[in-house]
């Protein structure tokens, strides 16, 4: 397993001069990580990353910054709502996915990652989010993005999230089987598959996901959770209730070189979380 970090968590509480792409990348390497999850709009302030900005020059810049630190970009994040009810907005979002795929291809990044949204402009869970119609809309709008991914030779990975359209194993498999694209992959975030309605069945829920989605999992996000009156709150690994034993055993046995990025860390706990995961991984 190759451990990395979500880059916009790095130096997030520091002054602006410490939040440049170069400074964040250098800090990630200093903290002992080998790869990063890169969301450009969250790491480079003051730039609107529409398709016009997603240029060949940007790809060269990204490649140079991370190459200098000997860091891989495990995934280029592009979190735009493909189930937005406005067709014009969907078309704009699709163009930004196309641009992200182009940058990924030119920068040597193997994967663009996304979540699956909600059938409203607010990108918020509502009564229709888990409907069949919402899933059909998402798949319809994902199709041209996958076609472009195939042309660029880049993987397009979706991340199931409990309160999004693709919320569980069954709906994930519906997308995989329905799209029939060799470039469609899965980002496995165990905590994001949990909610207040199923957290007490955590081991069963995650065991099913690892068993049935195994062949499709291309990357992992690792974080922890605590229970609050408003639901589950994500925290850095080692700061909540999560038991990583079965997950790390699965990764060691079935995905030995997979890239796994820590989420919800701070500069104060990132190294501690990395060392925890490394110790647990060595022991399983």
PLM feature segments, named:
Residues 2-10, 18, 36, 76, ...:
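Acidic/histidine-rich catalytic cores of soluble enzymes
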Residues 33, 104, 109, 217, ...:
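A structural motif
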Residues 22, 26, 61, 65-69, ...:
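Active-site acidic/histidine proton-transfer and metal-coordination neighborhood
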Residues 270-284:
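C-terminal helical cap(s) of enzyme catalytic domains, especially alpha/beta-barrels
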Residues 237-247, 252-254, 258-261:
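H/E-rich (His + Asp/Glu) clusters that bind or coordinate divalent metals
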Residues 21-42, 108:
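Catalytic domains of carbohydrate-active enzymes, especially glycoside hydrolases
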Residues 37-62, 116-122:
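Glycine-rich, proline-tolerant flexible connector loops at the mouths of alpha/beta enzymes
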Residues 10-11, 261-272:
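A short, acidic, flexible beta-alpha connecting loop/helix-capping segment that sits on the rim
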């Amino acid at each position: 397993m190759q451990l990395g970090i979500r880059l916009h968590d790095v130096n997030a509480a520091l002054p602006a001069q410490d939040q440049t792409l170069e400074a964040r990348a250098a800090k990630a390497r200093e903290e002992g990580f080998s790869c990063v999850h890169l969301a450009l709009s969250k790491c480079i302030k003051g730039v609107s990353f529409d398709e016009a900005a997603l240029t060949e020059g940007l790809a060269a810049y990204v490649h140079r910054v991370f190459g200098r630190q000997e860091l891989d970009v495990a995934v280029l994040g592009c979190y735009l709502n493909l189930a937005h009810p406005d067709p014009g907005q969907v078309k704009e979002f699709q163009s930004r996915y196309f641009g992200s795929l182009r940058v990924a291809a030119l920068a040597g990044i193997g994967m663009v990652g996304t979540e699956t949204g909600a059938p409203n402009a607010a990108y918020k869970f509502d009564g229709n989010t888990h409907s069949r119609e919402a899933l059909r809309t998402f798949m319809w709008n994902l199709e041209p993005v996958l076609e472009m991914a195939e042309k660029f030779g880049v993987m397009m990975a979706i991340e199931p999230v409990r309160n999004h359209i693709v919320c569980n194993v069954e709906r994930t498999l519906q997308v995989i089987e329905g799209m029939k694209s060799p470039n469609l992959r899965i980002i496995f975030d165990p905590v994001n598959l949990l909610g207040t309605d199923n957290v007490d069945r955590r081991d069963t829920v995650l065991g099913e996901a690892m068993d049935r989605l195994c062949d499709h999992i291309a990357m992992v996000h690792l974080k922890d959770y605590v229970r609050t009156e408003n639901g589950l709150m994500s925290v850095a690994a080692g700061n909540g209730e999560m038991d990583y034993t079965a997950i790390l055993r699965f990764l060691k046995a079935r995905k030995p070189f997979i890239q796994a990025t820590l989420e919800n860390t701070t500069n104060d706990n990132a190294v501690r979380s990395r060392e925890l995961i490394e110790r647990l991984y060595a022991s399983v």
